[in-house]
Every structure is written in structure tokens, then in C-alpha cells.
């Protein structure tokens, strides 16, 4: 039996391979740490207050803007305070993005990929009012209009991107009690999310219509200030990220072709673990495919959803592989028959599939709708926010439970191997040294698997927290550095690359040696014969199994059988 490359590769060659892969891992960390900026940046834009033009309130082709030729005149707070109705139904809050810097006009780049807007609302009540605390879940109706223009367009050439009338709920607290009015600061609310940043300039017009019969926007006094935080992916980070993807993609494709060719050379059908390795490589290749390069030429508002789907497929395949990988090395099995997904792993994998489908449905409910209406958010209603938060907490808890279960499976594998090592002293020294080396290599690989799983779960939880950070308004100190992101991404590729190489079938054949010859060898030749001794178990039931890929598995199953 030839076994795998992990079992037959010499110690020197294995050391060179591991050292090379570790060097690649360091390079991935350094790419993020030295060459990439922070993954995301943001700008805080204070809304300019402009007087609406009578008769144009319902004209979605009309926009007010605060900079450039034909800009509206900003109103002062004193002008609004002196008006008896606080200029109700006459105000338009204008946000023009991006802001200039040092008198230089900045523009968005397609490398920045996406744009998220969250709104900070400050409201005011007359101090003469008996109201001291606004009611919780204060409903706010907003007429939102988002427009765009490009670098070569005129200052007046704004085009409608999206229009919607949205409801948001405010949770406010008093921040300043004055003689004339009391100011209240409200929690930030999600406003919009663009899956593609295809244009150079964006303009946001917000109106707060008041209607007595409909009881619209009558629960609070008047708007005091609006602050928009626009969050975007940094273009420099995107460039480093795509360079990493572009470099890794052909290597993974090449190693998959090499692996599958070696499997099909053998006179047997592929084993379950070999199928899982090939599928895992396919999921990683789909994730590595630098589709984001298409957004530089084509507007793809579905790119965020597509990225989530690709990452979800990879997570599902990776989590499933780890369960099968550990399970295939739990070497005391109820039946010596060939392992299949349906026979051994359907309970474990069904939980992974259900969890991934749940997250996919949750993602479709938000980002699927946002492709048509970027102002939609599941976080807007109190019930929706609780459901979304529950999904995130449940996903994090599930990931932690999965990691603990995987640790338990690996511990059982180690325990099984430890129990089987009691049979090693009865073997010849050459055979014992060979199997001790296999056990050491296997344990090292399993510990690397646990490390990879731990970092993956940590990255998943931190990613979910970062996504919800601006939405549930918690002061969570998170530092998702570029080095961590590129390092973990590189780790996935290097880990899977190593598994495909090490678990590829080895074509090295062990020359036959009669057992009687072993007893006549001198002590000086025993260790040297380890490289040429056939590992042969004539009474082992699994020897007749054409899908067996590991002589370590054969060894432990034989001891269990005996």
C-alpha cells in the first residue's frame, strides 16, 4: 500500500515544505500590515439646511446641493428658531459626499467598492413643554433621495439613484437643558447601503414631512442637527486584497488539478476524504476568483450579496471538511465498510447546512432587498433589530459551539491513537519508528487544523460584530487590522494547499521484505531498513478496501480488530 505523501515524504523534504508555507504565511501578514491601509474609512458630514423650493417637493428630478455652481443657501439656526412653525415642511437637509480636503475636491473611486450611511439625529423641544424625556421608539418618517454625478458632469447634473419614504425609530436621551429649549441626542440609525460605489460624487436630500391627519412627524419638537457618517472600504486595502486573491487563485487551481490527476492514476475509486479535499479546493477557488475587478468597469450592486454567498459556501465546505477530516481519523468504527456522507456524517453536516441556510435567508432578507432599495434595513424596526441581533448572537454562539465540538473530536482522535500506541513495543524497531513518525506528523497537522479553526471562528465572530457595530450603536472596541484579515485569508489558502499536497496519494512503493529476514538484521541496519520495509498486515480487513488512503488508519484499525 502506497499511502499518502504525508506518510512517505522524507523528513528533510517535509521540513522544506512546511518552512516554505510558513514563509508564505508571514508574507500574507506583512502584505496587510505594511502595504495596506486600514480596511475601512469614514467621513462625518454635518447636514446643510436649505429652504425647499415650493412646488418641487414631489419632483424626484430636483435636488438641492451645498457646493458648486447653483448651490442652495444654507439657513442659520436663528432663522429657523424665529419661525413660528420652525419652518416645518420647508427644510431640506443636504449631504454632499465626499467632503473636500484642504480646498481640494475629492471623489470616490471604484476601488472603494461600497458605501454605508448611518445617521445621527439631534432633536429639540421647547423648555416650556412638559416633555422631559421623549418616548422610546419614536417613529420618524423620512423622504430620502439619493443622487449621483461623475467627474465630467456639470455641477447641476445630478441624477436620481434611489428614492424612498422610510420609517426609522429613535431612542433619545437629554443632552442639554437650556432656558429656551432642551436638546436630545438619539442613537444612530442605519440609513442606506450601496453594494457598488460606481460614481464619483453622491448627494443625499432628506425631508421630514409633517402631516396632522396622518400624525406624521408630530411626536417631537423639531430637528436640531443631522450628522451623516459615510463608511467606505479603503481603495488601497482593496488593491492589496485583490493582488492577494489574484496570486493565490492559479496556485490553488493548479494544485487541485495535480491532486485529482494523482487520485485517478490509482486503480480505485476516490475515498471520501479525497472527495472532500477536492470540493474544499473548489470552494476556495470560487472565493479566490477576483470578481471584484469587474466592478472597476461595470456597476454591480449585487457584489456585496455575491461576496457573502461565496464566503458562505466556503465556510460551509470548510466546516464540513473539518468534521469529516476528524471523523475519518476516529479509527474505531462500527463498520469497516466504506465511509459515506449519508452513513456517517449526515447528523453533523445537517447542522452546518441548516446554520448556513439560515444565515443565507437572513442575508437575502436585507441585502437582496437593498439591490432595489438601498434605504431598506432590517434594523429599522425594534422587532427587526431584535431579530437581526438574535441572528448575529446565535451565529456567534453556534460558531463557538462548533469549535468546542471539533476540539472534542480531535481529542477523541488523539485518545484513540494514544490507546493504539500500546501495540508499538511489540513491533520491530523499524516499523515502530515509522509509525511513531506518522503519529507525530498527524498530531502536528491536527493541531494546525485547530489553530486554523480557532482563527476562522474568531474572524467570523469579529466580522459579525463589526458589521453590526454601526447598527446597534454599542461602544465595542474592535481593531480589525489589515494584517489580521490578509493573514487569515492567506492562512486558509496555505492550510488547504498543504492538505491537498500532504493527503495526495503517494506513488512511492515499499519493496517487499520477508519477516524472517527482519530477525537476522543487525542492530545497525534496523533503523536504515525503515525506509525500505513493507508495511504489511495480512489479516487486516481494511486491506481489501480499495478506498483506504492512510497506512496510519490501517494500523489503528488493525489493532482495534485484533
Swiss-Prot record:
Tagged with keyword Amino-acid biosynthesis: no
Residues annotated as glycosylated: 58, 103
UniProt topological domain (Lumenal) ranges: 37-239, 297-311, 366-390, 463-482
One of the record's GO molecular function terms: Wnt-protein binding
Keyword Membrane tagged: yes
Taxonomic superkingdom: Eukaryota
Chief localization: membrane
Membrane spanning stretches: 16-36, 240-260, 276-296, 312-332, 345-365, 391-411, 442-462, 483-503
All ranges on the Cytoplasmic side of the membrane: 1-15, 261-275, 333-344, 412-441, 504-562
Keywords attached to this entry: Cell membrane, Cell projection, Developmental protein, Endoplasmic reticulum, Endosome, Glycoprotein, Golgi apparatus, Membrane, Postsynaptic cell membrane, Segmentation polarity protein, Synapse, Transmembrane, Transmembrane helix, Wnt signaling pathway
Protein's membrane topology: Multi-pass membrane protein
GO terms, biological process: compound eye morphogenesis; cuticle pattern formation; Golgi to plasma membrane protein transport; imaginal disc-derived leg morphogenesis; imaginal disc-derived wing margin morphogenesis; intracellular protein transport; positive regulation of protein secretion; positive regulation of Wnt protein secretion
Pfam families: WLS-like_TM (PF06664), WLS_GOLD (PF21883)
Protein localization: Presynaptic cell membrane; Postsynaptic cell membrane; Cell membrane; Endoplasmic reticulum membrane
GO CC, alphabetical: cell projection; early endosome; endoplasmic reticulum membrane; endosome membrane; extracellular exosome; Golgi membrane; multivesicular body; neuromuscular junction
Subunit structure: Interacts with wg; in the Golgi. Interacts with Vps35, a component of the retromer complex; wls stability is regulated by Vps35.
Family, as annotated: Belongs to the wntless family.
Purpose: A segment polarity gene required for wingless (wg)-dependent patterning processes, acting in both wg-sending cells and wg-target cells. In non-neuronal cells wls directs wg secretion. The wls traffic loop encompasses the Golgi, the cell surface, an endocytic compartment and a retrograde route leading back to the Golgi, and involves clathrin-mediated endocytosis and the retromer complex (a conserved protein complex consisting of Vps35 and Vps26). In neuronal cells (the larval motorneuron NMJ), the wg signal moves across the synapse via the release of wls-containing exosome-like vesicles.
Protein's recorded name: Protein wntless
Organism of this sequence: Drosophila grimshawi (Hawaiian fruit fly)
Phylogenetic classification of the source organism: Eukaryota, Metazoa, Ecdysozoa, Arthropoda, Hexapoda
